Amino acid sequence: MTAPLSLFVTGTDTEIGKTFVSAAMLHGFARHGLRAAALKPVAAGAYERDGVWRNEDADQLDAAANVVLPPELRTPFLLKAPAAPHIVAAQEGVTLDIDTIVASHREALTRADVVVVEGVGGFRVPLTDTQDTADLAVALGLPVVLVVGVRLGCISHALLTADAITARGLRIAGWVANHVDPAMSYADENVATIRDWLAREHRAPLLGRIAHLRPAIPESAAAMLDIAALVDTLRRAQH
């Protein structure tokens, strides 16, 4: 029996399409014949519907997954205010416990062939006074997919984030160029620069370029990703 696959999705910043790309990957994995589930361990920003607190990012992931996890497993920490998690957690009397997230991930792996774990914000977002999302990624021990929001400044953001990931002993399984600014000048040259630097310094392949889609449909974006290459990388990482 093939061991389940998993990856940790992070980004160069907040609001650069990390959830959108995660949803696209979920669709891609499903098309690849895999049972794909999503974990959004920490979500900040909730709304109430029918007496249940929900999160838009988590909803988008559920819509893309062909294995939908129970909400309390998919998102063990749902915070109400849309702000920095450690600040909101302190105000709401919640402790963002990494061990709880690791346990949720372990359970999720028993229910799917591949589990996409989406982080919150960028790679180093505080969860407590002493731990951040980089510590979470290390505790999970997963290959990382880096989502780069292609806009002015993205080269430095991408290289710095990649350095931070590998400095923690983690492998970058690949990166995705997500074109968030359709009016950006020299977008092709920016992507080419990031591609060359990340390949040379981190052996991190470009998994795909996602055009600025309107409407933003994850199913369409899935066709722009090299899911087969990602699956091969994840399987090799298990050995």
Swiss-Prot record:
Binding residue positions for Mg(2+): T19, D57, E118
GO biological process terms, semicolon-separated: biotin biosynthetic process
Cofactor(s) annotated in UniProt: Mg(2+)
InterPro entries: DTB_synth_BioD, P-loop_NTPase
Alphabetized UniProt keyword annotations: ATP-binding, Biotin biosynthesis, Cytoplasm, Ligase, Magnesium, Metal-binding, Nucleotide-binding
GO molecular function: ATP binding; dethiobiotin synthase activity; magnesium ion binding
Pathway in which this enzyme or protein is active: Cofactor biosynthesis; biotin biosynthesis; biotin from 7,8-diaminononanoate: step 1/2
Record's subcellular location: Cytoplasm
Keyword Lyase appears in the UniProt entry: no
Residues at the active site: K40
Annotated binding of ATP, by residue: 15-20, 57, 118-121, 178-179, 211-213
The reaction(s) this protein catalyses: (7R,8S)-7,8-diammoniononanoate + CO2 + ATP = (4R,5S)-dethiobiotin + ADP + phosphate + 3 H(+)
Broad enzyme group: ligase
CDD domains in the cross-refs: DTBS
The family this protein is said to belong to: Belongs to the dethiobiotin synthetase family.
Function: Catalyzes a mechanistically unusual reaction, the ATP-dependent insertion of CO2 between the N7 and N8 nitrogen atoms of 7,8-diaminopelargonic acid (DAPA, also called 7,8-diammoniononanoate) to form a ureido ring.
Name of the protein described by the UniProt record: ATP-dependent dethiobiotin synthetase BioD
Species: Burkholderia ambifaria (strain MC40-6)
Lineage summary: Bacteria, Pseudomonadati, Pseudomonadota, Betaproteobacteria, Burkholderiales
